[in-house]
C-alpha cells in the first residue's frame, strides 16, 4: 500500500475524548483526507507525553509528520493546504505556517519561520501580539529527515528538546502564510506542569 503524504499524530487523554473526536471529525471532512493518516494514541497516563509522542512518531508512515494534540484545533483547510504544499514544494524539508495561540487567556499569533532562533523571540505588532519562532513540532516535517530524533521521557519540555534536534536536519522550508493551527493552554486543565518561564 502506498504510504500517505502526511501523518497527523495526536497524543490523547481519555478525559478529553470529546475534543479528540471533534478534531478527527473536522479532519475527515476536509478535501485531501484520503492522502493522510490520522494516528491517535490514548492511554491511562501510564506513559509520559514524550513517550506517547515517540510511539506515534515510530508508527507514522507518511512522507511528512505533524503533531496536533487532542485539545488543539485546526483550520477548515488545514489538510488541504498542507497536502498542496507537500505536492507543490517537493524540495521542502519542513512546512511552516502561522498559529493562533491562547495561553492562559492571552491570545497572540505565532509565526513559525525556518531559521528563527527561540532564544531571540521577536515580539511584534500592537501590544506584542505576534511571536516569531523556529519550526515547532506542530509544523509538517519530512519524516526521513527527523525519524531518528527522540522525544524525552517527560511531561514538560519534550517538544522543545525534540525540535532542537529536528531543526539540525532540515535545510529547506516552505511557509504557508495562513493560520492553520490553534494552540490552547489553560493552567486549570493542562496535564503538564506549569513552566517556570511563561510566554
For every predicted segment, state its role.
Residues 102, 108-109, 117-141:
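A recurrent flexible, glycine/aromatic-enriched loop bordering the glycosyltransferase active site
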